[in-house]
Amino acid sequence: MNLSCSLVLLGGGKGERFNSLQPKQYTHLCGEPLILHALHAYQRLPFVQEVVVVCEEQYRELFLPYSVKFASPGTLRQDSVFSGLQQVFTPWVCIHDGVRPFVYADEVIEVCSAARKTGAAALASPATYTIKSCAPVRTLDRDALAVIHTPQCLDTEVLREGLLLARAMDFSLSDDTEAAELLGIEPTLVFSNRVQIKVTYPEDLLFAETLLSKSSTYK
């Protein structure tokens, strides 16, 4: 199966919950910015044809040693994705958060393969916590729920149309595959059996450092 795709790497978030002077995606993990851990992993994948980094202009110097394109971030995540999408010229696109430094080749391959069948796919984990809705307060069936991560892979035109529809509806998307859902497409979920780290708080960085220092399989 031809898995050729572009990567849109999101590096425009401000990370206000991280309590740092710089955005968390540029905080160092074992000597290297978080976002570069993700970039290096994707650059090792031969089917990734091009990389678009969505970031503020002041951080672009960090990526100059690499063969990447740039796009400017927007107000919302979906605006940043749409901005990156303007630089994409392949039929398929993979979206990844710059604050998710752990990228596993087999999971990217599985997500991209699954997307070819339905038009959209996302990496996921089973919900393991008890989750309640707030209004009214009631317990949800966690067996029917999943936690969504990146990578997420979509047909480029499906994502573009879904993002435009969301904008026309003034609708805030929770993730990228929700753009496909707006078009009536049911995304495929690819379940991971690994710990999926999104660095949101300082404690997440400590956990990531511990995991990385003890792992020989991170690739």
Curated annotation (Swiss-Prot):
Keyword Acyltransferase carried by entry: no
Lineage: superkingdom: Bacteria
Coiled-coil regions listed: none
Site annotation Transition state stabilizer: residues: 17, 24
Record site: Positions MEP for the nucleophilic attack: 142, 198
The enzyme's E.C. designation: 2.7.7.60
Principal EC category: transferase
UniProt xrefs under Gene3D superfamilies: Spore Coat Polysaccharide Biosynthesis Protein SpsA, Chain A
Catalytically driven reaction(s): 2-C-methyl-D-erythritol 4-phosphate + CTP + H(+) = 4-CDP-2-C-methyl-D-erythritol + diphosphate
Record keywords: Isoprene biosynthesis, Nucleotidyltransferase, Transferase
UniProt keyword annotation of Nucleotide-binding present: no
MF terms (GO), sorted A to Z: 2-C-methyl-D-erythritol 4-phosphate cytidylyltransferase activity
GO terms, biological process: isopentenyl diphosphate biosynthetic process, methylerythritol 4-phosphate pathway
Pathway(s) of this molecule: Isoprenoid biosynthesis; isopentenyl diphosphate biosynthesis via DXP pathway; isopentenyl diphosphate from 1-deoxy-D-xylulose 5-phosphate: step 2/6
Cited InterPro entries: IspD (IPR001228), IspD/TarI (IPR034683), IspD/TarI_cytidylyltransf_bact (IPR050088), ISPD_synthase_CS (IPR018294), Nucleotide-diphossugar_trans (IPR029044)
Chain's role: Catalyzes the formation of 4-diphosphocytidyl-2-C-methyl-D-erythritol from CTP and 2-C-methyl-D-erythritol 4-phosphate (MEP).
HAMAP family registered for this protein in UniProt: IspD
Family: Belongs to the IspD/TarI cytidylyltransferase family. IspD subfamily.
Name used for this protein in its record: 2-C-methyl-D-erythritol 4-phosphate cytidylyltransferase
Lineage: Bacteria, Pseudomonadati, Chlamydiota, Chlamydiia, Chlamydiales
